[in-house]
């Protein structure tokens, strides 16, 4: 919510360039949102790179994909060595009204001591953006079952059932030589379904990955600015949305801290 309240996000794709200069990238950034595959040269661990399924923040020279905020910072620092390709979008504040509606509601339920609704609203606030980048689980079975109660549970599906549905040889279960794949079964409003999270899944309906990518990019850049304010040598640990520092350095972030305001 801290970045969603005031940030702007990709709305409509306007161009795709296979190559480009840094100057052209700056022009696009001034007009809207951009995602770019770039070669980075840096001594600062400020840029994300997915390596072997893990998110890393390396130094040196590497190729990665950056969103608007990280691109602006990289260009300002002179860390963009080469632009391989980029996507340009128009931009709009997609989540401002969402945060304006639900953040005060969360504060209200917290003040009332209503933990159930406070946590429910917190989930709504924090999870909406991820829906734009969500992958669809492989649907193994779906059918009517009006007699079954609402439920959700883990289950297993034998490999022969799945051989024609997805590349099962890529699953962790296959690597362990197991004869089944882990799956989930659920029932809701008269429909029964079995799904599995497997390699090669498609994007979910109504997805737009650049939106979700920009939210996480803005959050990482905000966290990076806080780390610079504290001093990298004083950061003991950082995670998705938090820092662990010694209390003596807290005053350096005083202007950014508030009990209730974003």
Please place each PLM-identified region on the residue numbering:
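Conserved acidic
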Residues: 1-262
């Amino acid at each position: 919510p801290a970045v969603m309240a005031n940030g702007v996000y990709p709305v409509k794709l306007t161009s795709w360039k296979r190559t480009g200069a840094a100057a052209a990238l700056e022009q696009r950034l001034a007009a809207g949102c951009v995602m770019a595959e770039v070669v980075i040269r840096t001594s600062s661990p400020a840029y994300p790179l997915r390596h072997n399924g893990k998110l890393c923040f390396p130094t040196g020279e590497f190729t990665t994909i950056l969103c608007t905020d990280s691109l602006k910072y990289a260009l300002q620092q002179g860390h963009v060595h080469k632009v391989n390709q980029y996507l340009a979008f128009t931009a709009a504040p997609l989540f401002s009204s969402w945060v304006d509606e639900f953040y005060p509601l969360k504060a209200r339920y917290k003040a009332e001591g209503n933990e159930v609704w406070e946590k429910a609203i917190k989930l709504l606030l924090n999870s909406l953006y991820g829906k734009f980048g969500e992958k669809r689980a492989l649907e193994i079975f779906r059918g009517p079952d009006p007699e079954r109660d609402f439920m959700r549970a883990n289950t297993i599906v034998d490999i022969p059932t799945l051989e024609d549905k997805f590349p099962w040889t890529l699953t962790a279960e296959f690597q362990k030589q197991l004869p089944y794949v882990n799956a989930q079964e659920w029932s809701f409003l008269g429909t029964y379904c079995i799904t599995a999270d497997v390699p090669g899944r498609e994007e979910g309906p109504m997805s737009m990955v650049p939106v979700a990518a920009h939210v996480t990019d803005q959050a990482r850049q905000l966290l990076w600015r806080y780390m610079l304010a504290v001093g990298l040598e004083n950061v003991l640990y950082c995670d998705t949305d938090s820092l662990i520092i010694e209390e003596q350095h807290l005053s350096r972030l005083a202007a950014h801290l508030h009990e209730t305001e974003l």
